[in-house]
Amino acid sequence: PTQNQIDELFFLLQSRKYFISHKTPPSKKEHSDFVSEHPYLVWYLIYKNKNLIGSVYLQTDNSIGIDLIEYHENEILSVFKYIKNNHKPLPSIKSVRRDEFFINVSSENTNLIKILKNLDKYEIQRSFLV
């Protein structure tokens, strides 16, 4: 990724309301190092009317990471459509990876959960820290 893309991702990270993988946002250097050292299969910045509104990425477990400044059903649908039209899930590996795309959602992100349910997406798992 370019430095501009890393900066835009950092802006989104600072704007994020819900976190899954960390308790507090990383520093700009920590973020830059992470983005450079941990490439996802694909990572897209999402714009609407030339304004940055979020990012989406795919991982090797077929998970889709969606981070939008505000979650709206039409934008979620557009993300799903783009991903499905441009990418195929990796083949399943028993006990490792499904052969379908899925999304991990913070339990606090009730708006996205509601949108997914309205779109007839079904919940397959809940995770708990121990």
Show where each model-derived region lies.
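Conserved catalytic-core motifs of GNAT/GCN5-like acyltransferases
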Residues: 122-130
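Conserved beta-hairpin
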Residues: 41-54, 59
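Conserved acetyl-CoA-binding loop-helix of GNAT-fold acetyltransferases
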Residues: 71-92, 110-118
